[in-house]
């Protein structure tokens, strides 16, 4: 491996070394605060070396990885989200009696898997990254093993994820049988030169891969696990599952879609269009029926993945820009929303029912305000980053003339307003006497509160003045296209 390859791979090398080092620290000396601080230092170092890797990008590390601005941008997003989740989770994990330190080891390992996905340029590295991410998530979901819902969430995710991995492997086998190649670049060359004798096996393999990835992204009809798993998982793990896990898989999917020239495969486009419509409508309609905050946000997440699929199908520069910008917005909004749930919850008492948030403004006004901003942004209200993200997707859809998808996109956004406003109204209702008596007078975790405040600031700042972020994202899109 050359020095340039080594420099380009620094973020991946550092996160790997950090995971191993933290494992040894936990094995030798158990101290929750020390483990958390070591995790923060590791993630900050991973972020600090990204500019060094960017200086030598684009760098192909054959045959598995490509380190370009696109991969590094998503790595930065992954590490930043993991950093925020670490800060949000500290107060929550202090309430866990049984060995809270391993949580941070698993968080770093899951982040490693996600970062590998962002840099993958080969089906082998795709599968490696996906399995590291998935196995870490199995353990994280069932981490409070004394609680039945958490164990149930872990087992459900394990069984269904195993099935999706099998479909993924079968799809890879079909593509290899047809093309003799597993690298994304090799596939791109074969397709551009028309070297395929028949596209039947190739399209069947691609469809199976999309099915396997669709489970991870909880597209309809692969979404049935999402609400139960979100509800049963510890609050900080739910935040990770909703953001880092899905963001990394979608980053990989977008690279694969561009490399295989997805818009030229009519059958694939029709299939994904049906999935997008079903995902948007099902996510929003099912969210209307829920009284559990985690389940509402789970179905909201499903709907937002449908919105992102519209931008994916739009393709082109504007489509890639829309996807990337929306992921930044999505990370901020969902980290903030699940962050509020995290700082109010503990391992023994999750604040997840709508009734738990009724009248929150009257005893936690700051937290109610932050939650309100996050929900308004998820709904796409102007002056928030969510509005800019939705406008970007709409513009990409108009440029690609995806009228049916745009109509569904608008209808889904209107439906979403109802369940977001339902939560907001509950936040500001006058609490009952019993509710006031149950309100906890204890102070909120300082690090979690500061993290939420910073997320809210970014949400408003990039909603009002998104130009600097847009310029970065345009450079990222050019690196992929």
From Swiss-Prot:
Subcellular location: Cell inner membrane
Keyword Transmembrane: yes
Source organism, top-level taxon: Bacteria
Taxonomic classification: Bacteria, Pseudomonadati, Pseudomonadota, Gammaproteobacteria, Chromatiales
Catalytic reactions on record: a quinone + NADH + 5 H(+)(in) = a quinol + NAD(+) + 4 H(+)(out)
GO MF annotation: an example: NADH:ubiquinone reductase (non-electrogenic) activity
Enzyme Commission numbers on file: 7.1.1.-
Keywords of the record: Cell inner membrane, Cell membrane, Membrane, NAD, Quinone, Translocase, Transmembrane, Transmembrane helix, Transport, Ubiquinone
Subunit relationships: NDH-1 is composed of 14 different subunits. Subunits NuoA, H, J, K, L, M, N constitute the membrane sector of the complex.
Record-annotated membrane-spanning stretches: 6-26, 36-56, 71-91, 100-120, 123-143, 157-177, 200-220, 234-254, 268-288, 296-316, 323-343, 368-388, 401-421, 444-464
EC class of the enzyme, as a word: translocase
Keyword Transmembrane helix applies: yes
Name of this protein: NADH-quinone oxidoreductase subunit N 1
């Amino acid at each position: 491996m050359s020095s340039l390859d080594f420099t380009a791979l620094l973020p991946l090398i550092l996160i790997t070394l950090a995971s191993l080092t933290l494992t040894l620290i936990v094995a030798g000396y158990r101290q929750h605060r020390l483990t958390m601080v070591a995790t923060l230092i590791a993630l900050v170092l991973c972020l600090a070396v990204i500019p060094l890797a960017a200086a030598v990008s684009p760098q192909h590390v054959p045959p598995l990885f490509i380190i370009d601005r696109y991969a590094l941008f998503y790595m930065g997003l992954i590490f930043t989200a993991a950093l925020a989740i670490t800060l949000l989770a500290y107060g929550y994990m202090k309430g866990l009696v049984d060995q809270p330190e391993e949580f941070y080891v698993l968080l770093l390992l899951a982040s490693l898997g996600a970062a590998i996905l962002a840099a993958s340029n080969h089906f082998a590295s795709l599968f490696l990254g996906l399995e590291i991410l998935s196995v870490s998530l199995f353990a994280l979901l069932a981490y409070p093993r004394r609680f039945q819902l958490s164990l149930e969430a872990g087992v459900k995710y394990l069984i269904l994820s195993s099935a999706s991995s099998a479909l993924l492997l079968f799809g890879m086998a079909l593509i290899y049988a047809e093309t003799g190649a597993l690298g994304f670049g090799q596939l791109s060359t074969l397709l551009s030169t028309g070297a395929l004798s028949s596209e039947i096996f190739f399209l069947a393999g691609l469809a199976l891969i999309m099915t396997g990835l669709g489970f991870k992204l909880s597209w309809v009809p692969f979404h049935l696990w999402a609400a139960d798993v979100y509800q049963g998982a510890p609050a900080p793990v739910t935040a990770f599952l909703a953001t880092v896990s899905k963001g990394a898989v979608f980053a990989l999917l977008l690279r694969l879609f561009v490399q295989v020239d997805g818009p030229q495969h009519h059958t694939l486009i029709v299939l994904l269009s049906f999935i997008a419509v079903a995902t948007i409508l099902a996510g929003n309609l099912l969210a209307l029926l829920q009284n559990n905050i985690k389940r509402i946000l789970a179905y909201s997440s499903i709907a937002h993945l449908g919105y992102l699929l519209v931008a994916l199908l739009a393709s082109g520069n504007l489509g890639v820009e829309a996807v990337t910008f929306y992921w930044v917005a999505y990370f901020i909004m969902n980290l903030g929303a699940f962050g509020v749930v995290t700082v109010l919850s503990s391992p023994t008492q999750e604040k997840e029912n709508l009734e738990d948030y009724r009248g929150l403004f009257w005893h936690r006004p700051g937290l109610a305000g932050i939650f309100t901003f996050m929900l308004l942004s998820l709904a796409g209200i102007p002056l928030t980053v969510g509005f800019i993200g939705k406008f970007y997707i709409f513009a990409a859809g108009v440029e690609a003339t995806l009228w049916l998808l745009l109509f569904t996109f608008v209808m889904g956004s209107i439906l979403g307003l109802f369940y977001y406003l339902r939560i907001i109204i509950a936040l500001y209702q006058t609490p009952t006497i019993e509710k006031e008596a149950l309100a906890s007078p204890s102070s909120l975790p300082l690090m979690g509160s500061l993290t939420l405040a910073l997320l809210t600031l970014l949400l408003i700042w990039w909603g009002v003045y998104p130009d600097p972020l847009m310029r970065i994202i345009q450079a990222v899109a050019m690196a992929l296209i």
